[in-house]
């Protein structure tokens, strides 16, 4: 029988892993779950560590391709340009994230109504873009030019508002800028590696006094749950969106956001 703290860790880990790489906002789901189930403080402390499980999941799934691209970069201009494109897309998040971190954590993360509203609005945008995005010009993530990558990087910064979704912002940005559905998702995966690793390191430093060594068991449960769930999602997502697009996730966001908003307005 799991005790309540271990169950919280398991729930948070599964939520993080299942929602991090699909465009529904893992942070929004975690914060709303924390609010309604009464473990906001636990959610904040565990989230710092379980992010690492999701980071390692995408690194595991893409390890072979990542190593191949890095090895090819010194003599393959296409591979080199792709690595530069990922780093260029990462830079806006570094600058804006460091400058706005305090405000984001202190204000935006404490506003459940904002989170629910952003889930709904993001779902509407995702449904629109899934139908109305221009004809793709880039069917492979490695073909995205640097100026497109930089624009995606700035669009990613919108996801600092909880409920927007990092993967959602980058995928929508990619689709609107000419990436195919699979290419947009794959570039989002690669961009997540430095972005999430950087966010994890920065949050770990900022919350170093919050983490409790006596809770290593619960932390391990959340970490493993996030890792396993994220591996399964990453392996499934590319094939799914290639065949069906992103409408499912738009409706998911609208449904979750609407239920959460109704509950919040009712006083829960």
Curated annotation (Swiss-Prot):
Source species of the chain: Cereibacter sphaeroides (strain ATCC 17023 / DSM 158 / JCM 6121 / CCUG 31486 / LMG 2827 / NBRC 12203 / NCIMB 8253 / ATH 2.4.1.)
MF-aspect GO terms: undecaprenyl-diphosphatase activity
This protein's encoding gene: uppP
Transmembrane segments: 4-24, 50-70, 84-104, 109-129, 144-164, 185-205, 214-234, 247-267
Entry keyword Membrane: yes
Annotated Gene Ontology cellular component terms: plasma membrane
Protein's UniProt name: Undecaprenyl-diphosphatase
Entry-linked Pfam families: BacA
UniProt keyword annotations, A-Z: Antibiotic resistance, Cell inner membrane, Cell membrane, Cell shape, Cell wall biogenesis/degradation, Hydrolase, Membrane, Peptidoglycan synthesis, Transmembrane, Transmembrane helix
């Amino acid at each position: 029988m799991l005790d309540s703290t271990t169950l919280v860790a398991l729930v948070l880990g599964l939520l993080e892993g299942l929602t991090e790489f699909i465009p529904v906002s893992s942070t929004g789901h975690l914060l709303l779950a924390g609010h309604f189930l009464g473990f906001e403080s636990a959610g904040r402390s565990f989230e710092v560590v379980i992010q690492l499980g999701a980071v390692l999941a995408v690194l595991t799934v893409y390890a072979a391709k990542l190593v191949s691209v890095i090895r090819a970069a010194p003599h393959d201009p296409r591979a080199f340009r792709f690595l530069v494109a990922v780093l260029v897309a990462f830079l806006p998040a570094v600058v804006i994230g460091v400058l706005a971190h305090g405000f984001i954590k202190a204000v935006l993360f404490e506003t459940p109504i904002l989170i629910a509203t952003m889930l709904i609005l993001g779902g509407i945008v995702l449904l629109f873009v899934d139908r109305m995005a221009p004809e793709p010009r880039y069917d492979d993530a490695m073909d995205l030019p640097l100026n497109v990558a930089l624009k995606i990087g700035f669009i990613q910064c919108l996801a600092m508002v909880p409920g927007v979704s990092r993967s959602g912002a980058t995928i929508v940005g990619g689709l609107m800028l000419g990436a195919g559905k699979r290419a947009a998702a794959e570039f989002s995966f690669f961009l997540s590696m430095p972005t999430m690793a950087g966010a994890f390191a920065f949050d770990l430093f900022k919350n170093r006094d919050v983490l409790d060594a006596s809770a290593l068991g619960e932390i391990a449960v959340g970490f493993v749950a996030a890792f396993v769930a994220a591996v399964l999602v990453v392996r499934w997502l590319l094939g799914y969106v290639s065949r069906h697009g992103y409408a499912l996730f738009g409706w998911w966001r609208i449904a979750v956001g609407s239920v959460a908003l109704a509950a919040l307005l009712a006083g829960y």
